[in-house]
Amino acid sequence: MSREFSQNIVGSGKIIDFHTHPYRHRGEFMGMYGEHFYLEPGQMPEDLAEAGISVFCGSVIDSDHRGAMESFDRVREVNDAALQLREKFGSAYVPGFHVHPAFLKESLMEVERMHREGVKLVGELVPYLQGW
């Protein structure tokens, strides 16, 4: 987090939720009670704002996938989804991104790519979904 960003947040009265999982569709929704409580993807920032949260951080989770991954493609896809949501939600959303220990070269390339995109939050790491 840059010093300028930190200074703008500290003392501003802003509340940051550091552990969210924004989503584009139901397959990426991670709520425990999705059958009873489901927000449309675009409602998330509004719902958080109503709770007093002005900035939310986190990665997109592929809840449709469970088990070992045969390639890095799906990891890259959810990282791309986080970039898309950053465009949609603007400064209210700080995206996080995934890496995968079975794909070290690809993960290092992804760290470099996301850094070029201005994304510096690595996580959440999800061995329980990505099979490691």
Where are the language model's segments positioned?
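Active-site gating/metal-coordination segments in enzymes
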Residues: 72-132
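An N-terminally biased module of ancient metal coordination in phosphate/nucleic-acid-related enzymes
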Residues: 1-77, 112
